[in-house]
């Protein structure tokens, strides 16, 4: 929208400023950790998983109105492969079940003539990204305000991602770690503006990947980051990711997002519902609103800034759970 109205320069300029904004407010924003007891955390993480599942279903059907039998077969075989690996294997093989499912599913699709290799053929062998490739940034006030609002929404969503990872890895999430996470996102957004690309935020889909793989240390992430940098310099290899058929990807996503939902439910199982009926209200309202409003057109008549807030199910669930918990449980301590 910014690019259409003010040009690409204004869009990238707004990205740069919003990245700086996230870095500057990260310290203040990180103080929200105490607002996330188990009832809030469980509700938010459950909502993350449930709002992502329709994305997986759409991909399984190749995102068309009338999915073909081939699409359904590829999605089902991918899910089956991942399940069999998780049931009958252990250790390293089990941890890469998603990768194996994607590779085997893509190979089967290729044997059926459903894989388009043209992106690999069209990609250059080597490409070095250059700053301001599409022109110098322009700093237009309304675009900057809009992008800072979007960045704030992303920070709320990322908080839910950090909470989910904290529960999976059993690592405590304090204000310092939250601040560092926000700063990393701000730096990524800033670099995105400098290199004329997209803003980068915490990817909630990866929570399921962490849960399913069982990898809970940061070292593999460093290796993966280096590998992605290499792929960015060698576009032909990077283009290989583009040839994965949507149904195959959807099958893998279905398993991952299901894991995210269950992770949230496990947290809710630790909440005291028996002696505190208010917790029922908090979980019920926040999850129902988050799942129901995600991507809906209910607020299309409102200004764009409000639409961005209220059409993001994770943000809605987070805000509702925090506010309801603060009101209903303000004089109760979490056990």
Locate predicted features:
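Early transmembrane hairpin of solute transport permeases
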Residues: 1-75, 243, 247
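Transmembrane helix-loop boundary segments of multi-pass membrane transporters
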Residues: 4-7, 30-38, 67, 206-224, ...
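Hydrophobic core segments of alpha-helical transmembrane domains in multi-pass membrane transport
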Residues: 17-26, 43-57, 74-88, 99-114, ...
């Amino acid at each position: 929208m910014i690019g259409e109205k003010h040009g690409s320069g204004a869009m990238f300029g707004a990205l740069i400023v919003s990245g700086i904004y996230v870095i500057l407010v990260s310290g203040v924003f990180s103080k929200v950790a105490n607002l996330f007891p188990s009832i809030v955390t469980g509700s938010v993480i459950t909502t993350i998983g449930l709002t992502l599942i329709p994305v997986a279903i759409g991909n399984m059907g190749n995102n068309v109105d009338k999915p073909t039998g081939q699409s359904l077969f590829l999605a089902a075989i991918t899910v089956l492969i991942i399940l069999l690996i998780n049931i009958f294997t252990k250790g390293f093989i089990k941890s890469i079940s998603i990768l194996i499912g994607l590779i085997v599913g893509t190979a089967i699709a290729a044997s059926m003539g459903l894989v388009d290799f043209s992106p690999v053929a069209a990609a250059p062998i080597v490409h070095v990204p250059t700053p301001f490739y599409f022109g110098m940034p322009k700093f237009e006030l309304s675009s900057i305000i809009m992008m800072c609002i979007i960045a704030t929404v992303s920070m709320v969503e990322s908080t839910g991602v950090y909470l989910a990872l904290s529960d999976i890895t059993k690592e405590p999430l304090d204000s310092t770690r939250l601040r560092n996470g926000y700063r990393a996102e701000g730096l990524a957004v800033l670099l995105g503006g400098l290199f004329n690309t997209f803003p980068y935020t915490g990817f909630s889909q990866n929570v399921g990947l962490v849960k399913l793989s069982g990898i809970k240390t940061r070292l593999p992430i460093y290796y993966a980051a280096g590998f992605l940098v290499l792929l960015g310099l060698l576009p032909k290899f990077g283009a290989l990711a583009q040839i994965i058929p949507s149904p195959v990807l959807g099958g893998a996503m279905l398993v991952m997002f299901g894991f995210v939902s269950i992770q949230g439910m496990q947290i809710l199982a630790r909440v005291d519902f028996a002696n505190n009926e208010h917790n029922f209200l908090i979980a019920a309202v926040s999850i129902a609103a988050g799942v129901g409003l995600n991507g809906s057109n209910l607020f299309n008549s409102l200004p764009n800034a409000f639409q961005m807030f209220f059409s993001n199910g994770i943000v809605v669930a987070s805000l509702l759970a925090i506010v309801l918990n603060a009101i209903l449980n303000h004089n109760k301590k979490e056990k």
